[in-house]
Amino acid sequence: MDLEYQKKLAAKVAGVGLDRVRINPEKIDLVSEAVTRADIRRLIRSGAIEILQKRGISGARKKPRRKGPGSRKGGKYSKLPRKRRWIRKIRALRRELRRMKEQGLIDSKEYRELYAKLSSFNSVSQLRAHVGR
């Protein structure tokens, strides 16, 4: 028995997708007679047509579990884009440069010169080596 029409109508009446509409197999004959929206509403109330619960996000995804390096698929830059990587590096370098200036390891003139060429350093340790601790 084709109940496609009833299923579509039930989905529209309930405001849900087709996948969330379940027709009770024991009451198929009752559902097949339904033609109007009112009939469908009555069948939903009686339980012949059931609206399934919305699927949620699994607990493991909610709390960011299973996101370690072994679970990651995709390229190096799809996980941490170049821009994010750059931001992380440059912020660390600027933080270190500011700290050096505050501790008196470099003066204001050196600070400005180094700030301008920070992009040429790959890491904080490289910056420290250049300043010559």
Curated annotation (Swiss-Prot):
It comes from the Archaea. GO terms for molecular function: large ribosomal subunit rRNA binding; RNA binding; structural constituent of ribosome. One of its GO terms (cellular component) is cytosolic large ribosomal subunit. Residues 55-83 are annotated as: Disordered. Keywords: Ribonucleoprotein, Ribosomal protein, RNA-binding, rRNA-binding. It holds the Pfam family Ribosomal_L19e_C. GO terms for biological process: translation. Part of the 50S ribosomal subunit. This is Large ribosomal subunit protein eL19. It comes from Korarchaeum cryptofilum (strain OPF8). The gene is rpl19e.
